[in-house]
Amino acid sequence: MIVLRKWQADCLDKAKAHYQSHRDYFVQATPGSGKTRLAAELAKWLLEEQLIDFVICFAPTREVVAGMQRTFSAVLDQRFGNVIASAGAAYTYQSMEYQQEEFWDIFKKFRVLAIFDEIHHCAGHDPLLSNTWGQQIIRNIQDQATYTLGLSGTPWRSDDLPIALARYSDPEGQLICDYRYDLQSAVNEGVCRAPRITLIDNPLIRLVEEKENTESVRGFSCFSQLLSESPVSYEDLLRHDDILNAVLDIGILQLSETRHKTPQAGGLVVATDIEHAHQIAGILNAKHQSYVVVTSKTPRAQQLIDRFRHDNTCWIVAVSMISEGTDIQRLSVCCYLSRIRTELHYRQVLGRILRKMGPEDREAWLYVIAEPTLRKYSQRIANDLPEDQSTLQEKKLNDRLNQSHAEHANGNTVGAKESADNPISIKEQNGKGELQVTDASLLTLSFSQYYRQYLLSLM
């Protein structure tokens, strides 16, 4: 028998008391802390007390649904699949649109516990201001289910719409959680790994603009300055081989160190699109790293994810496949190279590497380009851990860097050219045409081989 974690037992007791007089219960718990196990234990208690007849679960993806089916089958010791069996079933939110009326009649004819994992995907309190999934909940479940359980690790939406079944304070409009288990508590109690978020920057960036018969050179001291004062975009950086090599080298080094202690540890690379994923895969291959690529176009992607979960492959490169709720405990290192810059998505990705494999498995590493928005999100996560101290690590910074700065200041670009191993034009590296300021302007971007690492970590 697996003993519940302290927070799970506490939340379970509070839920039992809450359901004596209320129908809806909302839990916010940090990703990787065991929300699904809590939900299964609560369902087991309600079934044993004969307060419900069935349990019906909804989740955002088939991968998460499969994980719920495994957990509920184990805890309930009964079949739990994608059809109503002895205990219940689990479905994707998308499937709600295609359910027949007979399915929704179950909520009217029987006592049902409806569980919504990552319920922030379902928006709205009324049909006019709801998304499709939220409308299904309002129409078919909200007033029909005997009990509801809403679960979320990141309980907000990028569009600021209210979450279905959630309650908000008035007039502040703050989400009211019946139980909250935050990242600080999860780390302090050893439930989750401590996140080590490393922002990767470059102190010596060279941008050459060729226009007609003239050439101008501009220098930048960080990515933030480059992005704000030049036509170069964040996605240009993500697709630049120099940047990819730098980020992946750091990730590979950390994964290698981790695998010395935990041989089955694996890494995740979050890519921008399918083309980008294969670009990253080519670099990993050149560095003799084992990997698998999973995208929406990958045949049998779910089987590949399941295989990676249990094998010894170093890296999984994913585009929107290793998402919230995906349980791959051996993931402990992540290179975030997605163009998506929302706090919701960023925290969800971080959650993929927080699950622990054992008591000695204490750290998770997230590597990200020091883009201003992602820097802000990283600092907010650090602020969730009051004991955190922001430290600066600079590797490979020496007198040569100072010399290169002086050469730039004096207009001498020879040293800068030597420090850029392989200057690549925007045209060559993104395949989408030249990056132009005017019709006759070509920009060539190159970087110093020296990268700064800003480490935000729990000390």
Where are these regions (language model features)?
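Interdomain helical connector at the RecA1-RecA2 junction of SF1/SF2 helicase-like NTPases
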Residues: 2, 160-261
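Conserved Walker A/P-loop ATP-binding site and its immediately adjacent core
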Residues: 33-46, 51-72, 272-275
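Conserved helicase motor
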Residues: 61-64, 92-98, 271-275, 292-303, ...
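Conserved pre-motif I regulatory segment
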Residues: 1-26
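Long, largely alpha-helical accessory region at the distal end of helicase-like NTP-driven motors
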Residues: 237-239, 243-246, 250, 254, ...
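SF2 helicase catalytic motif II
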Residues: 105-150, 154
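Conserved RecA-like P-loop NTPase helicase motor core
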Residues: 290-394
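Inter-Walker segment of RecA-like/P-loop motor cores
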Residues: 65-107
